[in-house]
């Protein structure tokens, strides 16, 4: 077996000495575990939120979080001035237009201690349960494309392969070719990083779909819809509120996506199953 010291250690992984018990034997070995640290979002010099996250792809995180939370509407409205890392954490120095900074004053609160957040800084139920503009997309994929993306995602999670402790989010084109993957200890963070990566690469998110290695919560559905991703597929189940949001926002929401199997909860017209629709056997 290859030891951690002979493998490439990514910023998202750290080496720890552990006591491993396996097959009736015990040994002290070096093992890789997922890195996690507080990441502070600082807009125009004023702290807004602190998120527990994996210290990789932090510029993508800054942009994706800002877009999915509605802090800015367009990537060009934001500039990451600096990504500063310290022994105890990291800070993202972000510049946004003055009117956007003023709006943040109504939402500001510290979120220290959470691995991701999809309803950050909202002070009312109405603000949390907002519905983004309805998605109008002609995207249609077949079940083979979904299966292809799922298979490709499995092979493109280096931190998960090393540690077994992170989530991943991927974007694939209509043929199921995975173009971007991002990982993080927080499922919301992984999706935010993906959204940021799409924006930085100037990829039109509406021309493909997203796959996540987690459940599909309300926050995940909201972030996908806010980013204009027309189809979100999760390997686990969605929540009832996520389904309601997806129905209202025009988002195709899929759960239990594994190989060629899945459950479509909303707007099924975007997934061609290649079979006649009838009663379950």
UniProtKB/Swiss-Prot annotation:
One of its GO terms (molecular function) is sulfur carrier activity. The keyword tRNA-binding does not apply. InterPro entries: Cytidine_deaminase-like, FdhD. One of its GO terms (cellular component) is cytoplasm. Keywords: Cytoplasm, Molybdenum cofactor biosynthesis. It is found in: Cytoplasm. It comes from the Bacteria. Its main location: cytoplasm. GO terms for biological process: Mo-molybdopterin cofactor biosynthetic process. The keyword Cytoplasm applies. The active site is at 117 (cysteine persulfide intermediate). Belongs to the FdhD family. Required for formate dehydrogenase (FDH) activity. Acts as a sulfur carrier protein that transfers sulfur from IscS to the molybdenum cofactor prior to its insertion into FDH. This is Sulfur carrier protein FdhD. It comes from Xanthomonas euvesicatoria pv. vesicatoria (strain 85-10).
